[in-house]
């Protein structure tokens, strides 16, 4: 079925929502959040795609930004609404986001596109492009690697989630084919930031709509 990977992942997040929300703070992409702030104008409107329990939305609201968050999981959204009452949250499939064109100054997609199938990603990037204003900034963080897999790990209470892995050049090509201009793109390993974390490589990508 077309949506089996999404339904399975939603079920995992709904099941472990409270435990996941407590663990997630330790995995915040601190340097990336600070850089994203420098790329936006004051009072910018940010779309947080795959906002989860509101960890990053809380940070951006505290910085004075307007934040709209979307997620597949209603249980995570319930936590986000309690945690960040000054942000707005919707349950939406980010393969078919329902907002007017050029609504946002920034799109923050941290560890969210990795739950899609590879063939779905170009369509979603095109939607991000449409939703951003001219000069708007897109941040994407995905796991580096090859292929797709269902993976159970401690962060997800050993329940299996779907992941698609990317190469740097592949992601760069996808963004440029959509029309984005790359600002900066790099990889890092979790253990380089927190020695007690996973030996896991991530790609962080900042790009801009001309």
Cite the ranges covered by each PLM segment.
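Acceptor-substrate binding/catalytic loop of class I
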Residues: 153-169
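Core SAM-dependent methyltransferase catalytic element
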Residues: 191-210
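Conserved S-adenosyl-L-methionine
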Residues: 180-191
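Conserved class I S-adenosyl-L-methionine
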Residues: 1-41
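Conserved beta-strand signature within the Rossmann-like core of class I S-adenosyl-L-methionine
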Residues: 135-142
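A short glycine-rich, Lys/Arg-flanked "PGG" loop and its adjoining helix->strand segment in the class I
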Residues: 122-134
């Amino acid at each position: 079925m077309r949506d089996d990977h999404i339904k399975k992942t939603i079920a995992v997040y709904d099941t472990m929502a409270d435990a996941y929300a407590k663990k997630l703070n330790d995995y915040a992409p601190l340097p990336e959040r600070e850089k994203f702030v420098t790329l936006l104008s004051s009072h910018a409107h940010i779309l947080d795609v795959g906002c989860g329990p509101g960890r990053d939305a809380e940070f951006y609201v505290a910085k004075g930004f307007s934040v709209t968050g979307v997620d597949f999981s209603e249980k995570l959204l319930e936590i986000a609404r309690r945690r960040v009452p000054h942000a707005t949250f919707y349950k939406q499939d980010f393969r078919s986001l329902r907002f007017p064109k050029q609504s946002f100054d920034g799109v923050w997609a941290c560890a969210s596109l990795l739950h899609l199938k590879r063939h779905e990603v170009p369509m979603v990037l095109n939607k991000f492009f449409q939703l951003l204003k001219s000069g708007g900034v897109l941040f994407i963080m995905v796991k580096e690697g090859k292929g797709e897999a269902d993976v159970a790990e401690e962060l997800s209470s050993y329940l299996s989630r779907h992941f698609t892995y990317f190469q740097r050049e592949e992601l760069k090509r996808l963004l440029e084919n959509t029309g984005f201009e790359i600002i900066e793109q790099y990889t890092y390993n979790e253990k380089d930031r927190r020695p007690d974390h996973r030996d896991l490589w991530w790609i962080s990508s900042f790009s801009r709509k001309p």
